[in-house]
Amino acid sequence: MKLGRYSLFLLCPLLASCSGNGFYKDNLGVIDKNILHADTSLLKSKNKEHYKSSDMVSKTDSIYIGNSSFQTYHGEPLPGKLEGVHGIILRSSTPLGFDEVLSMIQDSSGIPIVKHTTKDVISGGVSSKSLAATVAEKMNSATGGKSTDQFDHLLLEVSSEHQLMDVNYQGALSTFLDKVAANYNLYWTYESGRIAFSNEETKRFSISILPGGKYTSKNSISSDSNSSSGSSGSSGSSSSDSGAELKFDSDVDFWKDIENSIKLILGSDGSYSISTSTSSVIVRTSSANMKKINEYINTLNAQLERQVTIDVAIYNVTTTDSSDLAMSLEALLKHNGGVLGSVSTSNFAATSGTPSFTGYLNGNGDSSNQVLLNLLAEKGKVSVVTSASVTTMSGQPVPLKVGNDRTYVSEIGTVLSQSSTSTTASTSTVTSGFLMNLLPQVADDGNILLQYGVTLSELVGSNNGFDQATVNGTVIQLPNVDSTTFVQSSMLRNGNTLVLAGYEKKRNESVDQGVGTTSFKLLGGALNGSASRTVTVICITPRIIDLKASGE
């Protein structure tokens, strides 16, 4: 019986461990699943499947199907029997005027044709003759001569020459209607069983920008705080004056620029209406001007719809010889990319607040910067500070912050009253880490003009990053921050990696120990020292995203 009890006691921990082991496996499975999900999401944020190739010739092993679509602006489709290779046959031995051409089309197709126009220039010879007479009168008046019938007739022939059209055509009716419209600067539609020609065309265009009256881009990253604390019913407040801040202000009125461009294209021939709430423009003008407006807006939308994914990685290299690292970086970039600006091979001093080394690596499809990391690993111990990917539209800035906000007591005050004494404490916030603002602009040739502003800051105080000051027995925390801020711009090819280096931190340590005093080392002691340098290397890789090519 006792043996049975002992066995039962021994089995209890075993059963408990089995139960705990089950929970452990379940939790481990959940953790592994979350890690996998995080890694998958990180890869998706890089948009690798949408990278646009910068090669002159692109190859694919998959089936190619064009995904470009177009919209017809001529109303209803014409009858199918008139759209074939032998849809309509029109021939004339002599050039015809506008009305004669319309009569021939109507007789051959059986479709009635109407005109909606206020211009007399296409309605017949009377207006052309009047125009010729007016021009002749002005020219004769300017030259001191008198108008003659021969001169009027000559000008009439010159002014009405563009009114005539050679007709010798066989094919689709819509193609011939396009030719007629182009010859007379008109616009045609087919609706309700009839063809209508008009000297003006009305069309609505969508603009690929956000709705709003004025598109203003003001991006900033800063660390500010307001807080209060107190005792005995007292209160206090504070604001941060030691936080890090990086700001890009870009005040651009897209709609004003679009309006000025449309005015320039239309001149006095046409009208327009801009709707900033729907991001659209309605234009009414001649067919020739409408083609120019259509080309301008299509080009504008293509520029505005360009997207860029920017990979940012920051590495710290701890080494004892920074000059060797600088020369090695220079050799690597000259062989695999290029060096931008001057290079200081003696050291990596960043006293000017700007990187002393700037270059780029040619893109090879490797987003992990493995070639650069292999070189850095040969020169010292490499650690990854941060790695992130951001996506933005061409011409729109995007901020990135990887840092730590620290709150500290910046002020302590005492409030005296008749009945009590209270103490107030004011706090502030200081930010250390990495702040960046990126502004990419994709050029027509596929290159990327990249403007980047960077702020690197670090708490270096002796007491966990802070220094301390004692005032009347009260200890005040004072943040000691080392920071570097700069704004630069570079022109890069799609997929190139911009390499910024030159931010160096030196650390010198010395140890002098003895018994009683540091100079007495007979009974034991030590005297040694060490020196190290930490160089920060920033890698920025912009890549153009081609969503249309990926079928999205």
Curated annotation (Swiss-Prot):
Membrane topology: Lipid-anchor
Cellular compartment(s): Cell outer membrane
Entry coiled-coil feature ranges: none
Gene induction: During exponential-phase growth; repressed by ammonium.
Pfam family, one: Secretin
Lipid attachment points (N-palmitoyl cysteine): C18
InterPro entries: Bact_Secretion_Sys_Channel (IPR050810), Secretin_N_2 (IPR011514), T2SS/T3SS_dom (IPR004846)
Principal location: membrane
Cellular-component GO terms for this entry: cell outer membrane
Residues covalently joined to lipid (S-diacylglycerol cysteine): C18
Domain of life: Bacteria
PANTHER family per the UniProt record, alphabetical: PROBABLE GENERAL SECRETION PATHWAY PROTEIN D, SECRETIN GSPD-RELATED
Family listed: Belongs to the bacterial secretin family.
Protein name: Outer membrane lipoprotein BfpB
Species annotation: Escherichia coli O111:H-
Lineage of the organism: Bacteria, Pseudomonadati, Pseudomonadota, Gammaproteobacteria, Enterobacterales
